[in-house]
Amino acid sequence: AKSYRYNLDNEKYELTLEVDRDDIEDDNIGVYSMVIDDMGQQSRLWPDDLVFAALLAGGTETAYDGTAFFSNSHTLGSETIDNLFASTALTADNFAAARAAMMEYSGEDGESLRVRPDVILVPPALEVKARKIVQASTIVESGAAVDNVLRGLCEVVVAPQLSTSAGGLDTTWYLLDTSRPIRPFIFQQRMAPELVSLTSPNDEHVILRDKYLYGVKARG
């Protein structure tokens, strides 16, 4: 079997806030404290931003075989693997077809990869459709209520980062298998988010500028 290699380039994260010392001392209602807490929250969401940016670039960034990550012409041994269902609206039938296609993936040796999609990832515009498909107890067929055989097949995950306003498409949805040791996404944390501050009267920044400095940094 061939071996394939991916390079994960680390990126730095930095967010800095400079505040007049007087403003901090006069902040009786804790506004700046909330702003600083929000900086910490933003840093904890940074890995999500990196992952979704990579996902949205899947139509152009190349995979192991030199074709786009999402493509209908991946080569694996003698097999051609299609992981792109272009212009496929989110419907119950299309969901079932895409799920079945993924479960039929095989490796270089021709053996089944045993893929079992367990997450449907959608932008907010598709949340209701997705939940109806995999969470509704019954559906209507030919005017009659019948059991929904797709119920419980996938967990619905909604990501605002996938919306049209965020650079994605409100009509695009993804099926993932998160049950395996090799996950759909990898975040390589090198340095956890760290909040640093220059607020001591002896800090040079405070002495020279009469300002407090708060910052968050991370790397991954």
Enumerate the predicted regions with their spans.
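Alpha-helical scaffold segments that mediate packing/assembly in large oligomeric complexes
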Residues: D22, D27-M34, Q41-E104
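Flexible, glycine/threonine- and acidic-rich loop/arm segments that mediate assembly and lattice contacts
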Residues: A1-F52, I207-G220
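Generic ordered-secondary-structure signal
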Residues: D9-N10, W46, A53, Y64-F69, ...
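Conserved beta-strand segments of the P-loop GTPase G domain that flank and frequently precede/overlap
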Residues: E18, L121-V122
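Sequence/fold signature of self-assembling virion shell proteins
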Residues: N72-S106, R114-V119, A125-G220
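Homeobox/homeodomain signature
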Residues: N7-D9, E14, G59, G110, ...
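Structured alpha-helical segments in the cores of large, soluble enzyme domains
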Residues: K2-D9, A97-D109
